[in-house]
Amino acid sequence: MRNVIRRVTTMTFTFLLQSPPLPISPSPPQFSLSSSPLSKTQRFITPSQGSRLRTLCTKVIIPNMQDSGSPPLSYLTQREAAEIDETLMGPLGFSIDQLMELAGLSVAASIAEVYKPEEYSRVLAICGPGNNGGDGLVAARHLHHFGYKPFICYPKRTAKPLYTGLVTQLDSLSVPFVSVEDLPDDLSKDFDVIVDAMFGFSFHGAPRPPFDDLIRRLVSLQNYEQTLQKHPVIVSVDIPSGWHVEEGDHEDGGIKPDMLVSLTAPKLCAKRFRGPHHFLGGRFVPPSVAEKYKLELPSYPGTSMCVRIGKPPKVDISAMRVNYVSPELLEEQVETDPTVQFRKWFDEAVAAGLRETNAMALSTANKDKKPSSRMVLLKGFDENGFVWFTNYESKKGSDLSENPSAALLFYWEILNRQVRIEGPVERIPESESENYFHSRPRGSQIGAIVSKQSSVVPGRHVLYDEYEELTKQYSDGSVIPKPKNWGGFRLKPNLFEFWQGQPSRLHDRLQYSLQDVNGNPAWKIHRLAP
């Protein structure tokens, strides 16, 4: 077994490296590097309209039933769970493989929400002979595609085509299958996550070999917690194996999973779950079923395949860290012009699916050197500088009138990248501000008139009332005048720093500084210690 694991772990399984190369448009539509005036040729940045990365799970907090004032949450009996399955696969037309695929994807999405592959890459899925085991096989396949390194222990294989097909799919991905005999004695040394997919809500009686021994081994891992030794986290699919479906772990000697992924709706035993992470998956319950069984369940936001139930665990902020895995940032590989290098990174961030790639932290200081920061949106850039728009009488506008220097910070988490830019700031010509103002949606134009930015208002209703009044005033489509105190700023860079996160905090930092070379300005690249 150790040789199998050793062979597989020599391969690099990170999400970034498994994904296809990020497409970079040779002629990005968001901006231009033309040296012509901004108002004539530089196209402003617009939000990305699509992404090839989809959110599979979004954290939504639903307080526990025990908490006062919490919303109701339904729990199913064993009989109700079976009836719902029969209804789904009967008159409602669902197939078993369809439900299994959705359930397994929900389990994988829940795991990926909490246990990132950079730190929890080695996953052992222990699968039973029934539908719960099938969910585990599907989850393992999705985890492989998410960048994890799954191993499968499937001691009692089912000969039905559905299950043999799932095995074939995993074989085609070279996912290793490990027998019970080949499992290491100490699971804590070879695995970071163990998926308990042995038994589901239809299980009765006591577990039989080899599952009784496997359950005991998972229970024994909990002893590591008492000795503060590192141990794999346990994720149970729908029911912690060995628990009574309704009464839970009534002898208090069973598996105590770190995560429970309830499917369709939580079963009664989930009331006794005390782990830090409880998720709901299986986004396929039709309204007719919810109404018949009076199901009160949290909503799945957006395109999410799972949703958190209960309060998230308390977090030790000092222990929060990410082990970055990224390509190296080398001097010989970057562009000599930092604006061109920024454009390349910006394109890659857009292609990676960031929602607001142009969001940046703008830091200013007033005449007394008192700093202030806020998030704003970059609206254009070229070799002449980086442009954003605001109210000149706002806090940032006031700071820049007193001290016309600023720093910008872009943070693109999904790529482990940051870019810092510093330099003097000036107002852009009024004509450019006028042109951009009238390119905005009419609602935004009216909003700029309504908002005397950073001034005190007695209530939100004041803004709404003025907005409604102006909307009626300009409902005929007439030109909305740009406020005199509204316009753009341009930062002319004299320093860039490109930061790429790396393992063990040995990050790459390349700084471009503008220097005088033979009477001409030139960019000099230095590597900075992390």
UniProtKB/Swiss-Prot annotation:
Catalytic activity line of the entry: pyridoxamine 5'-phosphate + O2 + H2O = pyridoxal 5'-phosphate + H2O2 + NH4(+); pyridoxine 5'-phosphate + O2 = pyridoxal 5'-phosphate + H2O2; (6R)-NADHX = (6S)-NADHX; (6R)-NADPHX = (6S)-NADPHX
Subunit structure: Homodimer.
Highest taxon above the source species: Eukaryota
Induction: Circadian regulation. Up-regulated by light, heat, jasmonic acid, ethylene and abscisic acid treatments. Down-regulated by drought and salt treatment. Not induced by UV irradiation.
Summary of the function given for this chain in its UniProt record: Catalyzes the oxidation of either pyridoxine 5'-phosphate (PNP) or pyridoxamine 5'-phosphate (PMP) into pyridoxal 5'-phosphate (PLP). Involved in the PLP salvage pathway. Has a higher preference for PNP over PMP. May also catalyze the epimerization of the S- and R-forms of NAD(P)HX, a damaged form of NAD(P)H that is a result of enzymatic or heat-dependent hydration. This is a prerequisite for the S-specific NAD(P)H-hydrate dehydratase to allow the repair of both epimers of NAD(P)HX.
Broad class of where this protein is predominantly found: plastid
Binding locations of pyridoxal 5'-phosphate: 247-250, 325-327, 379, 436, 440, 444, 505-507
List of residues binding substrate: 321-324
A single Gene Ontology CC term: mitochondrion
Organism (species): Arabidopsis thaliana (Mouse-ear cress)
Protein name (record): Pyridoxine/pyridoxamine 5'-phosphate oxidase 1, chloroplastic
Pathway linked to the protein: Cofactor metabolism; pyridoxal 5'-phosphate salvage; pyridoxal 5'-phosphate from pyridoxamine 5'-phosphate: step 1/1; Cofactor metabolism; pyridoxal 5'-phosphate salvage; pyridoxal 5'-phosphate from pyridoxine 5'-phosphate: step 1/1
Residues noted as binding K(+) in the record, renumbered to the chain: 132, 196, 241
GO biological process: NADH metabolic process; NADP metabolic process; pyridoxine biosynthetic process
EC number: 1.4.3.5, 5.1.99.6
